[in-house]
C-alpha cells in the first residue's frame, strides 16, 4: 500500500482490494497484527498499573489527549497510573472493533473501548471521583459508604508510526460517549464469589508468572 493510497481524498476504513504481491500482502497482515497488539497492550498496561509497559505503547515524542490529560504520552503514564491507584480499587479495559489503515511506516486506527472501575466508598473517595452531586445522592439513599462502579465507553483514535521496526502510538485522542455510575453489585461473599480468582495491579498478578522458562510446570 503506497503513500499515494493514503491521499487526502481517500475514505478511511473503506473496503480494499488486496495489494499486489505476496510479500506486500504478508507485510500488511503482519503490520496490522502488530498494531492491534499495541492497542491491546495499552489495556494490559493500564489495568496492571504498569508504568513502564504503558510507556512502551507510545513513542517518546507521542501525545495523548485523554480528557483529564493532554500532553506528552510518557508523562501521561506517570500521571495516570498513580491516579488510578489512588482513586480506584480495580479496573478493566477492553479494546475491540479495531479498524486499521497502514501506509508504509504510518498507520491510522480507530478502536472501541469499554472500561470498568471500582471506587472505594466514603464521602472523600466518592466525591473526588464522581463529584459532590453524586455523593449527595448516595448519602441520601444510604449508599455513600458502599463501593461504587464506574463504567464508560468510547473510542481510541490513533496515529501510529513504525520506527526501527517497532510500531508505537504517535498521536492518541479519545472519545468518551457514555458512562454509568452505581453502587457496586459485585457478589463478594458466598455463592460464586468463593471461586473468584482476583487479579492484581502489580507484578504479583498471575500474568507476570507466565514464562517459557517454566513452560512445562
Predicted feature descriptions by range:
Residues 2-15, 108-110, 153-186, 190-192:
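Short beta-strand edge/turn micro-motifs at domain boundaries
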